[in-house]
C-alpha cells in the first residue's frame, strides 16, 4: 500500500512491529459524517413510550440480564435490543427485554436516535451515541478481558468520554439519566474529522 492508516493504538503498534512503518491514527469512517448527515438516512422510530436501548455483543448472560431487568423497573422504561438471535429471544422475555422488529444499521440508528438512555458494548455504539448526543453508558463486561481489544477505550479517550465507561454492576448504583456535556466532545470530534479529511486529501493529491 502507498497509504495506510489505523483507528487504534494497538493497530499502529502491530504494524510498526511487523513493518517498521509508523502509520497515522485516523478517525473511523463513521465519524467523517455529521449527525445531520446520518439522520438523513433514518427516521424516528414510532415507540410512544420512553425506552432504553441495549446494544451488546451477546444477550445470553443471565447475570447481566437480571441487572438490566432491575434497571428497567427502576427507571420505569422498557429495554429494547436489536438483531438478537432467535434462540435468545425466549430467554430475554423473562427479563422484560424486548426485541425491536427492525434490524440492520438503519434500524439500529433509528432506534438509538429515539432512545432516552443508551447502553452499549461496542465501538460504533459509542460513536453514534456521541454523534447523536445521547445519554449513554459504555458497558464493560468482566467476562471479556481481552487487553488487545482497545477500541472502546481509545474512542472514549479521544472524545473525552472516559467517565461514561462503567461495569454492569454499576448500573444500579449511579444515575443513568446523567446528561453528557457535548461541547468539548463536539470540538474533539471535529478535530478528528478535519485530520482525517486532511490525510485523505493528501493521498488523493499524491503527496
What is the role of each PLM region?
Residues 1-207:
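Active-site anion-handling motifs in enzyme catalytic cores
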Amino acid at each position: 500500500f502507498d497509504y495506510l492508516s489505523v483507528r487504534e493504538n494497538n493497530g499502529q503498534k502491530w504494524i510498526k512491529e511487523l513493518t517498521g512503518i509508523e502509520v497515522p491514527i485516523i478517525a473511523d469512517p463513521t465519524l467523517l459524517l455529521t449527525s445531520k448527515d446520518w439522520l438523513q438516512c433514518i427516521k424516528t422510530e414510532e415507540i410512544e413510550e420512553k425506552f432504553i436501548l441495549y446494544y451488546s455483543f451477546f444477550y445470553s448472560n443471565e447475570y447481566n440480564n437480571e441487572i438490566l431487568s432491575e434497571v428497567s423497573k427502576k427507571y420505569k422504561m422498557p429495554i429494547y435490543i436489536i438483531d438478537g438471535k432467535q434462540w435468545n429471544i425466549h430467554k430475554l422475555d423473562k427479563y422484560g427485554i424486548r426485541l425491536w422488529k427492525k434490524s440492520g444499521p438503519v434500524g439500529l440508528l433509528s432506534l438509538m436516535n429515539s432512545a432516552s438512555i443508551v447502553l452499549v458494548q461496542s465501538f460504533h455504539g459509542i460513536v453514534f451515541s456521541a454523534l447523536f448526543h445521547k445519554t449513554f453508558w459504555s458497558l464493560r463486561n468482566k467476562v471479556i478481558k481481552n487487553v488487545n481489544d482497545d477500541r472502546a477505550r481509545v474512542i472514549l479517550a479521544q472524545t473525552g468520554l472516559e467517565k461514561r465507561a462503567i461495569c454492569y454492576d454499576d448500573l444500579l448504583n449511579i444515575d443513568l439519566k446523567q446528561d453528557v456535556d457535548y461541547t468539548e466532545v463536539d470540538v474533539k470530534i471535529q478535530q478528528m474529522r478535519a485530520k482525517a479529511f486532511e490525510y485523505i486529501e493528501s493521498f488523493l493529491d499524491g503527496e
